[in-house]
């Protein structure tokens, strides 16, 4: 998770644990009564059937291992920059002043010109209403070039609110300021639903940094309803950061096809990030938020 309660850095065995679970499932499917042969794969002791059952098990093991995220020995790394207008940081407030930024959000085009997009887990336990959370677009180095916008409403899917389903880790927020619309001030990203995995630019605000980071790399499929993105530096605070496809060189805006969140609430290590895939559930939630 990349919100304030995430323990990034303390869990470093995620890949090993996931592999072990997959190996156990593959072994169970091979038949418990078969003769066995002890082998070792990825440092995990495995008991596998001897004879021709070993061939079927080897296929299951290879399939399990292949679906794990790939990481390059020379992985890309996010670089700090001064920000872009339609992406910003979510802050808590204290005494009417900005306190700490804890997650990332982006402005998305809507009929009312007032919707933001982030990860649902970012809002868990946060004080919505009465100015408890504000959005600061293009925040950097203590500067708020487009001001601070109060969050007045939050929209999440019922599957998230009832059981925190990782495939529904997305939220739309309404941002308000008397007499103005945020989209008129900052411009907006487009919402992309049902699009395939592709090259993206991901922007996020690490909570210990004064500037956002940006990185371009492929977003790959991770199961039927998730995406995975390999780039280092996406630590606490980057949850909700948009996966931007087709970014315009002229405006810096693009099409949001995901946000950091989903599996492991965005990832247990800074070099691998996840997002849900934007499918019919996100389209329906967007329509609800647009009407609400």
Residue ranges and their predicted role:
Residues 2-4, 19-110, 284-292:
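Protease-domain processing segments flanking chymotrypsin-fold serine proteases, especially trypsin-like
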Residues 82-139, 219-223:
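Catalytic histidine site
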Residues 96-97, 112-113, 122-125, 141-143, ...:
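Solvent-exposed loop/turn segments at secondary-structure junctions
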Residues 151, 166-237:
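Chymotrypsin/trypsin-fold serine protease catalytic domain
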Residues 233-259:
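Catalytic nucleophile loop of clan PA
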Residues 257, 263-292:
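C-terminal cap/linker of serine protease catalytic domains
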């Amino acid at each position: 998770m990349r919100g304030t309660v995430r323990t990034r850095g303390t869990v470093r065995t995620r890949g090993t644990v996931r592999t072990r679970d997959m190996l156990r499932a593959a072994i169970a499917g091979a038949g418990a009564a078969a003769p066995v042969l002890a082998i070792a794969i990825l440092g995990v002791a495995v008991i596998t059937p001897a004879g021709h059952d070993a061939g079927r098990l080897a296929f299951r093991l290879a399939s399990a291992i292949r679906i794990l995220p790939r990481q390059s020995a020379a992985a890309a790394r996010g670089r700090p920059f001064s920000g872009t207008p339609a992406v910003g940081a979510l802050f808590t407030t204290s005494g009417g002043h900005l306190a700490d930024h804890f997650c990332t959000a982006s402005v998305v085009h809507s009929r009312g010109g007032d919707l933001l997009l982030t990860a649902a887990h970012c809002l868990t336990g946060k004080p919505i209403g009465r100015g408890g959370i504000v959005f600061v677009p293009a925040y950097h180095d203590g500067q708020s070039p487009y001001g601070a916008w109060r969050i007045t409403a939050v929209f999440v899917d019922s599957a998230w609110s009832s059981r925190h389903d990782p495939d529904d880790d997305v939220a739309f927020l309404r941002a308000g300021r008397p007499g103005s619309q945020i989209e008129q001030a900052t411009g907006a990203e487009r919402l992309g639903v049902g699009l395939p995995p592709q090259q993206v630019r991901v922007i996020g605000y690490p909570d210990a940094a004064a500037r956002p980071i940006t990185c371009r790399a492929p977003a790959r499929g991770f199961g039927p309803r998730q995406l995975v993105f390999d780039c280092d530096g996406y630590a606490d605070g980057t949850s909700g950061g948009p996966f931007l496809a087709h970014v315009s060189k002229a405006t810096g805006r693009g099409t949001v096809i995901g946000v950091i969140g989903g599996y492991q609430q965005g990832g247990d290590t800074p070099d691998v990030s996840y997002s849900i895939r934007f499918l019919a559930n996100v389209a329906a939630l967007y329509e609800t938020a647009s009407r609400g």
